[in-house]
């Protein structure tokens, strides 16, 4: 149950009544009418912009509309007051019984409270991580993996049919570099000195690949030229790297539904088919691009190339898809891959890219818009860098030196749950500081601890109540005398719980799972605030001498626990029941 939706329904019903009474003209579009929490809680429980958005189309002053609407709303038994503010905003206060009833609603709904059907079963593809299969996942990949997986969980929670997908970049030059690097480790496995020259991958993680190559091929490859072993070693090493990446993702609690290969697009006609589709729309042509300003991109050359008219769909310049020598640009297989996703029948596509792919956003959106005839929206989320800190100092990683911090390093030091939560404590496009010491601190400044501690406190109340012989099942607590929850701090906590369904829908519509982490921190803050006030005000403690009062307060605590567990589930974090 979304209380904000319920009150919005009331507002639109009263606007309809005003139309019938001749106070408003017929045919007004009410889609922009919103009901939301006011920016300042002192102004009320909810606020609506109805009068402001209807003033111009109705030809009436906003305050006049607001005053007439306020009179009607104040007559509803759920509304204790309706006050006009400023030029025509309408602030509403709800009666305590509405808030108190929310506790029973949450307990009766259980883990379905907050779940939504706004996705209406639409098929959405979330592509994320898609790291080059050239080594173990590093800390930069961790953030993209967590954001992508949490977004997938959020969308499923809100009613979408979600597919998690990993695009294996196994068609470019980097996998040849991997093969050459692995071959040196193969030589090393035979007692020869490896030649890790400039440009190769130096990491020790390739030593087991060399050993595995030795086990499979013996010394049969040692005296052969690169042209005889490159393809086999490339496929062998790529598969071993992908197995390592799958294990890394599993350690982070991420499981993909689909792995798609870039290599599978070459020589199969898929790239040609995608470009033929664009050609049918007169979006492919031969031409020479103007020299770019600033840094020259890899795909620019001062000769005639095959170009995609991406400017027809919002890009800044047209983009090369085939070079003058007849080879494909990096963009061509990406177009084909996204065309494949479109033809698989997805209603929406989401790509999670590293911030260094920012220049790819417009061209990729243009390609999908063209290939789907505007039917399939593509949202691209850019993931900013993670800055590591340890002992108060920046902790830098160097892939070239083979000493970068891996996903496993992070998970082994702080755990999967802490890693996942911390990666969602900033919006995806903001740089995130990851302090190995602070994320394990038991303090208010550590959001992971703060939220988990709230859940542990709730469970301690439930345990003590059981020890006193109380029935603390959700079904029984839902029948408590909830009128006893009348303190402003208790009502404020319930009001925060009432925001959960609305928060879920907003986060899902905007593809922003960090909103869930932010909300959980705010909810935990309300719970801790009430708990701490109970240290000075005995009447606010969750366990009271009067069993009737106790039952009501325990019901409130349990309702908070229901929502915290639901939110942590979306983040892929296991709730902690007890702090030791």
Curated annotation (Swiss-Prot):
The keyword ATP-binding applies. It is found in: Cytoplasm. Its EC number is 6.1.1.19. It catalyses: tRNA(Arg) + L-arginine + ATP = L-arginyl-tRNA(Arg) + AMP + diphosphate. Keywords: Aminoacyl-tRNA synthetase, ATP-binding, Cytoplasm, Ligase, Nucleotide-binding, Protein biosynthesis. InterPro entries: aa-tRNA-synth_I_CS, Arg-tRNA-ligase, Arg-tRNA-synth_N, Arg-tRNA-synth_N_sf, ArgRS_core, DALR_anticod-bd, Rossmann-like_a/b/a_fold, tRNAsynth_Ia_anticodon-bd. Belongs to the class-I aminoacyl-tRNA synthetase family. Monomer. This is Arginine--tRNA ligase. The gene is argS.
